[in-house]
Amino acid sequence: IDPRKSEPAAIPNIHLPVRPGTDALLIKAMISIIIEIPGETKAYITPNVEGWEKTTPWYENFEAKAAQAVCELDYDQVLELCRLMTTKKWCMHPDLGIYMGRKSVLNSYMMNILGAICGVFCVSGGNVIPGMVVPMGFHADERDPKTWKTVATNMPPAAAGSFPPAVMPEEILSNHPERIRAVHVSACNPLRAYPDTTAYEEAFSQLGLLVVNDIVLSETARLAHYVLPCRTFYESWDTTFFPWTFPKVFFQLRRPIVTPPEKCLEASQIFTLVADKLGLIPDIPEDLYEAAKADRLTYGAKLMEWAATEPGALKAMPFVLAKTLGKEWDSAAKAGLWGVAMTAPKAFRKNAARIGFE
C-alpha cells in the first residue's frame, strides 16, 4: 500500500496506490469490510482482545465503497484483499509514510485493530512483538493527576514518555506564562519532519533560544541561535535500535571507524557538558576518575561506594558515567550503555542466557 509505485510496489501480487493522506480512511474501510465477512477471527478475538464490543460500532454501517472512491482505489480489489486477510497468514510492516503522514497516531491505532480482528499478532506467520534491551521510555497514565501535561493543549506524555510533536507550535505560540521559550533539538529536523511545518517555522522563529546539535546544517539548524556540530554515526559509538533479525536476537554497539574533526563531540557528550554547566551533576571525587582508568570491576565497586553516600548520584548517573568512564573511552554513550548492562533486570539476564551468554 503506497501512493508511489516504488521498487517494492513493483513486486507484489497486489499494489494499492492509495491517495496520499487517506491511509486512515482506507484502514477504517478495511476494518468495516472485514467485520462483515463471516471469516472474521472471533476465535482469536475472544481470548485475546478486550473491549472489542465497544470498538465494533465505530466501524459498522460505514460506507466503505464511498471511502475507496476518496482513496482513489478500486473497491473490488480492496474487497479481495480483505477476504484474503481473513483467510491467509499475513503480517504488516508500517513505515515512515504511516508514522510521519497525516493522522499518524490514528493510523497506528487502527492498524493494530486491523491486525487483531484478523488474528495476526503473536502467531506463526503473523506479526511478532520483539523484545528490547531496555525500554526507551515509559508510557504515562493520563488519568493520574500527578502526570504533567502540556500547558496549552493539556496533552500527557503518553507514548514512551514523549509528548506528541504536533502540539509543540501551539505550546510555543500560546500566551501562557509557562509556555515553551527555549528548545534544544538533537539530531532531527522538526521544521521538515513534524506535522504542519508552516506552524513550526512560525513557532521556532518566536523562541528566545533555539539550540541544535546535528551532523548537518538542516532547515532547523539554519534558524537556530546556536549550532553544536555532532560527530557522525561513523565517528562515534552507536547502537542499532531497529534490527530486522528476528528470530535471532542482536543488539549491536558499533565502534567508530572515522576520526572526527577536532572539538567535534558525540551528542551525548554535548548533553553532558550542558548538564554540567546547569549544575545538574554532583561533585565527583578524584578517586572515581582514577578508578575509571583501571578495570571495570574496580571502577564499579568505587562507583557504588560513592553513590551510596551521595544523594544526587543515582539521578545523575548517566552523566556521572559520562564524565568518568566516558572520559576514558571518549564516549558518553558507550559509558551509559555499560551502566545499562550493569543494572539490567532479571528478564534481561534470562533472555541473554537464551542466546548463549553465561
Task: Enumerate the language-model features and the residues they cover.
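Surface-exposed loop and adjacent secondary-structure segments within mature catalytic domains
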Residues: H15, R143-K146
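Cofactor-pocket helix-loop regions in the catalytic cores of large enzyme subunits
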Residues: I1-V123, V128, M132, T153-G356
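Short, conserved secondary-structure transition motifs
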Residues: P135-A140, A221
